[in-house]
Every structure is written in C-alpha cells, then in structure tokens.
Amino acid sequence: MKRNFLNYKLLTGIALSMGLMTACSSDDSTNEDPTDPEVPAVDSRWITVAGAKMGTNPGDGNGGTYIYSINSEDAKDPTVSIDPFENGFIAPSNRTARLQSSEDGSTIFNISYAGDTGGNYTKYDVQGGNTFQQLGTDVNISQYVGTAPRWVKLFDGDQTGAAVYVNVAEPTIDDNGTPDDISDDTYVRTDATIGVVTLDLENSLIKNFEEHSVPLSAEEEANGYYFSRIDMPTLNAAGDKLYIGGRLSKVDPTTTESDSDYTILGSKTIVLDYPSLLNPTVITSAVGHGNTNGYRSINAFEYNGSVYQANQSDPEGSHILKIDANNQYDDSYDFNLDDALNVNGAYILAWRPASNGKAVVAYRHDDSVEGVAGAQGFFALVDLNAKTAQKIDAIPYDPDFYLFQYQGFVVDGTEIYLTQGAVGENGNIYIVETETGEVTKGAELVNIEGSHFIGVF
C-alpha cells in the first residue's frame, strides 16, 4: 500500500525531536545507548521536490512553482507517494520560481521571477510537507538587476547569492564627419553593460553592486559580436574571482540588423575580482564553442581546485570545460559529450557533480524525439577525471520527458537525487550512487495535466 503524505505535522515533530533530522536506531528491549558505536546511525535530510504547473501550454511552467518536502529515507521509498501540485507550497513567483537550497536542505532560497513581485528575495525554513516558514524579511533587488533576475547561490557555505543582468545598447555608428550621408557611416560596436549584485543570504541584505561595460576583442566587436545574456556566477577555489557565463549574439556590421547566421566563437567567461566585483576581463576557450550561461540550473562548479563549466549550442556538441586556478581555460582538457555518449548534437540542460568528481548530466541531442513541450531529455553519469559519460538506462524515458527547464539536483555524499516524470504524467524520485552507478527508484511523484517536475533541492 502506498503511503500518501498529505500532512507532515506529525513527521515534523518527530524530526525536531530527533534533532535536525538525525535519527539513531534503538531497541527498547535492550536499552541500547544510541550513541554506542555498535548501533548504526542513519543520517537524513530534507528533499524538496519542485514542480512547475502549466500556464497556457503543456510544459511552459508558467502556472506557478509548487514545492513539497520529505526526508531522504522516504524519498528513497517507492511506496511513498506525494502530490506537490495538490498539497504543495506555492513558491512566490509570477512565472517559474528560481529556487536554490542550502547544502543540508534545511533552507530554501527564492527570488521571484517577473511580474509585480519580480526580483523579490525570500528564504524559508524547511519543516516538511508543505510547511515552509519564512525567515527574515523580503529583499527586493529589482532596482539593481530588474524584475526577472538570473541568480544562483555561490558555494561559500550558503552565505552569498549573486544575481546578474546585461543591458544591450543600440549599435554605435561613426558618421565619419558626414552626419547627413548614411552611406559613409561605419559600424563601431554594440555596447553591453553588465550588472552584478551580491546578496547576503544569512541576513537578507544587499552586499555589493557594480556595473561594467565589458568589451570583446577589437576584431570581434568590429564583426558585430556582443554579450547578449549572462548568467550562472561561480566562485573560484581561492574565493577571489567570480566567473560569469555568457552568450554572444551578433549584428551584421553593414546593416546593424540582427545576424543569425554567423560563426560561433570560442566559449567565453567574464572574470571579476571578488568580492569587489571590479576589473572585468574576458577569457576564451580554444576547446569549446558556444554559450556558457546555461539556463535555469547552475552551470559551473568548483572541483579539486578548478571550475568545471558546461557549454551549450556548441556546433560539435556540448563540452564540459575546465578553468584552472590561474583563472584561464585549460585547453588541454577536452571533454566532448558527443564523443563520450556516441551521439550528435549533445546539449547539456543541467548538471551537478558530487565531491568525487562524478556527476549526473541532463541532456538532449539531435535525435531526441520532439515531445509535447520540446525535445526529449535523458540523464547520464559523467566522470570529470576520466572524461567519460554513460546514459543512465535504469531511469525510464518518455518522448514527453522534458528537461529544458530542469533546475535542481540534491547531492548527499556520493549520491545524487533527481526527478523523473513526463509532462502531465506521474514520475518518481531516483537516486544515483555515483561511485557504483547503482540507481534506486524512490518516492512516486503525482502529476497533473500539462505540468512537470523541475528537480529536487
């Protein structure tokens, strides 16, 4: 019989009495000391499932974001059934909320996306089920980065978040001293001004804000290239540089009209001093081409002293790129997902490594079936050290399994939790043991028409 979790007050009380979700097995008949090393201890944490409700079209996620939490033991139990859309907490956001969580899963951070409340930061204490208790006051950052900010939590012990935006100006034209003769005009460049704000997650305060005009090389700018989108700030291992992924667009210098048929340049990252957010520079990969801004999931992670970054829209298929401690791309590190998975046009939609350098990657490729909301997605187990990848066949796939909006994985030791479920269909939590590749089918996720699950936190 499936256990339906409709009210978590009882479980919350039990969890609190255990002391921050740490449970020790005991036997009343023997009066064993739960601190005895011979008594096995079971550590647990909250797993928060997020679902994006349909707005107008299946899979658009514009009907709101619903979250619901269970402990990790129940997340691994396929007899448990939860219904986030019927019983969940609505994360404040006009469109799909941009969620982050603390490393231990006890806190959810949210910045509302678009609408009247766009740019509003809130954080919540996770108490189980649909109980999320707001902590502190709201902070609105829209005056710094607009009402639809792109933001992530930096990996600095849950202390800081960083949000970014880019403002693209009209092309700069030199009239060469003859303002009435447009035939003599010369295209100069398209200026892109970036803004970066850092947010104190602990005290709900603005820490810093800076704006910069970030130029490309003279040749690239003369040919019409400019940064059109930035996202996914990431700290280096030393904590003194902030890397920001970027997407380039292009205008035709002869007409200043948008140019969609152009050579894709080497993948680029903007580097700022941290925490000052000053002295912007741009680094370029000679291995990967295309974008490094990702979409809705964190796109770059520090591991073993370097930052590993996914790219998208690469003509040779997505790569995982490496930025070393010298804050430059390591072009000796060549990890191409097309080659590793034996597919064409691999596109990394979201990914997350564990501390052992093994990661779960959500991806699509050129032969993905077109489903009700977009191209079918898959999961792969990746080894950053060996530069290998293998599709996780133990997870079921469906033509309507849509991962483009996927946001969150939970890392617990060497285990990675994820959600599976086609648009409008029930699914499950799955847990991947990255050391062995073993996959555990966990709790059932109950869906509603046109909606989909966007991860766990």
Predicted regions, residues:
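Bacterial Sec-dependent N-terminal signal peptides
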Residues: M1-T48
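Short, conserved, GDST-rich strand-edge loop motifs in beta-rich repeat architectures
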Residues: A52-G61, Y165-A192, D240-G266, Q312-D314, ...
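Post-signal peptide N-terminal segment of secreted/secretory-pathway proteins
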Residues: G59-D184
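Beta-propeller blade signature
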Residues: G63-E73, Y121-G128, D181-L205, E257-L277, ...
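Beta-propeller fold detector
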Residues: K76-F89, N130-Y144, T193, T198-A222, ...
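Repeated scaffold domains used in trafficking and secretory/extracellular systems
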Residues: G88-S101, I141-G157, E221-T234, H289-E302, ...
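Acidic, serine/threonine- and glycine-rich low-complexity intrinsically disordered segments
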Residues: N208-V372
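Loop/turn-rich, solvent-exposed surfaces of beta-rich toroidal or solenoidal domains
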Residues: A346-A422
